[in-house]
A protein has these predicted regions:
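Short loop/turn segments that flank or connect secondary-structure elements
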Residues: 1-180
Length: 180
């Protein structure tokens, strides 16, 4: 593996037994594909990868936000927080990997969401709709701006629950491609 792929990571922060990306991510790459919410065929039982040294470049190059954002505490490791934090050109994405209402309304999540919105950092969430279908993505900044400014924890939690309920009802595409 090229050391440049890990030069931006927080020193000493390792995945350990966390396998959130190996299970929950949808991977569609020329070199490798894996459905969302299914364990990768190369994953070992207690975490880790059978082909770690030869794993596809898409796996070598990707890291959750916990691995490269030093301001995130150890509680933010996905298997501990219940949220896989991703980052892309559009900002930070909260992808709950456990019960979305519980994970997204935790004080840990609300502190980061509130701080991000207050600083103008684009935030979104990716909420599962139904088994076998893609998650629904939704921006958090505009719908949460007013309640974040109110600094009312119950108001923020209630608004997040409303947004999660809305997302869960959305029609999304099947994870499995169908021939037309």
């Amino acid at each position: 593996m090229n050391e440049d792929n890990e030069s931006h990571l927080v020193p000493g922060r390792e995945c350990g037994e966390c396998t959130a990306c190996c299970v929950h991510l949808l991977i569609k790459d020329d070199e490798f594909e894996k459905p969302a919410d299914q364990a990768c065929s190369h994953m070992v039982e207690k975490g880790g990868c059978k082909i770690y040294n030869d794993r596809p470049s898409v796996c070598q190059d990707w890291h959750c936000a916990w691995r490269f954002m030093p301001q995130l505490t150890d509680e933010w490791r996905p298997d501990r927080s219940g949220i896989l934090l991703r980052s892309d050109e559009n900002g930070i994405i909260f992808q709950p990997i456990r019960e979305p209402k519980k994970a997204m309304t935790s004080s840990l999540a609300i502190e980061l969401i509130g701080g991000g919105i207050a600083q103008g950092i684009p935030l979104s969430m990716s909420i599962p709709t139904r088994k076998g279908y893609l998650s629904h993505g939704m921006s958090l900044n505009e719908p949460l701006q007013e309640v974040v400014e109110s600094r009312s924890l119950p108001a923020i939690q209630n608004k997040l629950i409303d947004l999660i309920k809305f997302s869960k009802k959305q029609k999304t595409d099947s994870i499995i491609a169908t021939d037309s």
